Regions:
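AMP-forming adenylation/ATP pyrophosphatase catalytic core
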Residues: 121-126, 137-425
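ATP-dependent adenylation/nucleotidyltransferase module used to activate substrates
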Residues: 1-154, 164, 172-181, 246, ...
Length: 425
């Protein structure tokens, strides 16, 4: 069997190649370039040339052929353009998930097959099992601190049938040890950070290359607003209703985020100084205050703390909502601010993906799974409720910063990743 290893220059893919070679497979390595910064769209420490050099040295050390493939056109069309589009809508995409489903196990797989590969192997910390009928299961990696199954949540059966994850049963220290013992050039290389196969990037600068800056208000919302909010009161009451009694509209209501657009600020005139110069100011508002300015609501994301430039508080300030239509960013004080906390999210029917189609839920069904809404989040107990108007995830405990555009991923008790979907809200 001929196997192509996606060699990135990092220690994980290097050890994956090493193990396959030792196991007697016919192995070759291929490095993919996913970006040409010819238009100045990205300014960052991408270091892809150094990564390629290290990858080639690793392949030479192991004794396997090395190839290079340029997938920058596919990456721009399927990942980068999608990122810009989502941020422009006020959503927060996950490019690493798309990089795997659209690039590594699609365009890269196709390129590998042209070189005669039967399978593609990567350095992901996850496990794959093949059932007697040929169906593939994907499970969390053995190392709980490095499990990367989340990033593979959009893979389908065809892709999984051609995938191998040689280090899925190993712990990170074991991988480092194997690399050091084999004297691989990547043994001491730090784990990669930043956008998948592009590198460490200043994201606001990256986005501003394509998305226009536009100043707007940063509005701090006080607890008093929630005390008078009918929507907030309704959500609290619906959470007390038995799940089987919740209608489709009830679930929609629970999953919808709070709407702060009704917060308005009136102005008044006053005279200042010895010359009694006439000036204008905002009238005091018991529910909110204009706390600062920003350069564009699309550059901010739910739960964001850095880059707000708002001081004078005893607790940290977090983004609780953005409105790109009105170009407003809403913030709240404290990690437990009411605007950060929710228990229900919705995934549109067309956005629901089941890794094993046989596990697909039908409208009217409810199942309990373990769910995470971001990479490395501890798994959360939740009830999945399938209705005609979407798949709803109702968590047992309140969740912080449920973010539109991110992926919700659900697992069985044995660690099998069963499905995923883009969070609508």
């Amino acid at each position: 069997m001929k196997i192509c290893v996606g060699l990135s220059g990092g220690v994980d893919s290097s050890v994956a190649a090493l193990l396959l070679k030792r196991q007697g497979y016919d192995v070759f390595a291929m490095f993919m370039q996913n970006w040409h910064d010819t238009e100045g769209t990205l300014h960052g420490d991408c270091e892809w040339e150094e990564d390629r050099f290290v990858a080639e040295m690793v392949a030479r050390k192991i004794g396997i052929p090395f190839y290079f493939v340029d997938l920058s056109r596919e990456y721009r069309a399927k990942v980068v353009d999608y990122m810009f589009d989502e941020y422009a809508k006020g959503r927060t995409p996950n490019p690493d998930v798309l990089c795997n489903s659209e690039i590594k196990f699609d365009a890269f797989l196709e390129a590998a097959r042209k070189l005669g590969a039967d399978m593609v192997a990567t350095g992901h910390y996850c496990r794959k099992e093949t059932l007697p009928d040929g169906t593939c299961r994907i499970l969390a990696g053995t190392d709980p601190n490095k499990d990367q199954s989340y990033f593979l949540c959009q893979l389908n059966q065809e892709q999984l049938s051609s995938a191998m994850f040689p280090i899925g049963d190993l712990l990170k220290p074991e991988v480092r040890r194997l690399a050091a013992e084999a004297d691989l050039p990547s043994a001491d290389k730090k784990d990669s950070q930043g956008i998948c196969f592009v590198g460490k990037v200043d994201l606001p600068v990256f986005l501003q290359q394509k998305l226009k800056s536009c100043e707007g208000d940063v509005v701090e919302v006080f607890d008093a607003w929630y005390e008078q909010s009918e929507k907030y009161a309704l959500d609290c009451s619906l959470l007390g209703v038995p799940v089987e009694n919740l209608s489709d509209e009830d679930l929609l209501e629970l999953s919808r985020p709070l709407d702060y657009s009704g917060i308005q600020f009136e102005t008044e005139t006053y005279r200042s100084g010895k010359k009694h110069i006439k000036k204008t100011r905002y009238k005091p508002n018991p529910y909110a205050v204009i706390a600062g300015r920003h350069e564009g609501a699309q550059f901010y994301t739910m739960g964001q703390r850095k880059g707000l430039g708002i001081g004078g508080h005893s607790k940290p300030i977090f983004v609780i909502s953005t409105d790109v239509a009105s170009n407003r960013v809403y913030v709240g004080e404290g990690e437990d601010h009411k605007g950060l906390m929710r228990r229900c999210l919705r995934i549109l029917p067309e956005e629901v993906h089941w890794i094993r189609p046989s596990e697909k839920m039908e409208p009217g069904q409810m199942r309990r799974y373990k769910v995470r809404i971001r990479y490395r989040q501890p798994l959360q107990d939740a009830l999945l409720i399938c209705r005609e108007n979407g798949l709803f995830v109702l968590f047992d405990l309140t969740q912080r910063s449920i973010t539109a555009g991110q992926f919700a991923v659900w697992y069985a008790l044995d660690g099998e990743m069963l499905g995923s979907g883009v969070i609508q809200y």
